[in-house]
Amino acid sequence: MKKYQFEVCANSVESCLAAQAGGADRVELCAGIPEGGTTPSYGEISTARDMLTTTRLHVIIRPRGGDFLYSPIEVRTMLKDIEMARQLGADGVVFGCLTANGEIDLPVMQELMKASQGLSVTFHRAFDICRDPEKALEQIIELGCNRILTSGQQATAELGIPLLKALQTQASGRIILLAGCGVNEKNIARIASETGIQEFHFSARESIKSDMKYKNESVSMGGTVHIDEYERNVTTAQRVINTIQAIKS
């Protein structure tokens, strides 16, 4: 039987613990999920590290939402955040940088990789909006990254199966491809069988209603983007179990 690895995109310490309870091998801890994930706080990383005992902790290093073209100030911030993650005991970090032309930003990536020595490094879904994925794959391998998180440059990994399969063949064991975005208990087995990929990234979240008794629903904390303050999405152990069992059954 193939040895699969499962990473949960965790939006809180609560989600990290649910991932661990469900049998995940690793979590990617992120804040700012509506923006695609941003660097979590010192307190969140530290608490997750204290409470995770069997599940590895990776931390996204992304100073803001939006594109992956970073200013010198943002790069400086990322370097400090990598050092913070290291000091707090993270097992790995997750980042990715592009040039204005959609190429891998090699000078910035080299700087971040140097700062990440001793940590596992995942090049995140900046890969999915790069100009030339085949060329980028070779460059990321040369940089020394351990894995690439990708949906095959599509809205979901299921839609990206053709490119994921081609990239898995091209990689030929030189780097791990981590299939992510829209991976769930209904499609993980298909993605695995059609691509040959053995690592999967998913959120396994469910919507939880707030315990607030008093609610002022006329005010939104998200400005022009409406986010329901009286509902939140958290990973559940049962959905993690279901997703893992779907591929192992």
Curated annotation (Swiss-Prot):
Family to which the UniProt record says this protein belongs: Belongs to the CutC family.
Keyword set includes Cytoplasm: yes
Places the protein is found: Cytoplasm
Xref: PANTHER family: COPPER HOMEOSTASIS PROTEIN CUTC, COPPER HOMEOSTASIS PROTEIN CUTC HOMOLOG
SUPFAM superfamilies: CutC-like
Gene Ontology MF terms in the entry: copper ion binding
InterPro entries (UniProt xref): CutC-like, CutC-like_dom_sf
Name of the gene: cutC
Residue runs in coiled coils: none
Keywords of this entry: Cytoplasm
Cellular component terms (Gene Ontology): cytoplasm
Superkingdom as given in the UniProt entry: Bacteria
Protein's recorded name: PF03932 family protein CutC
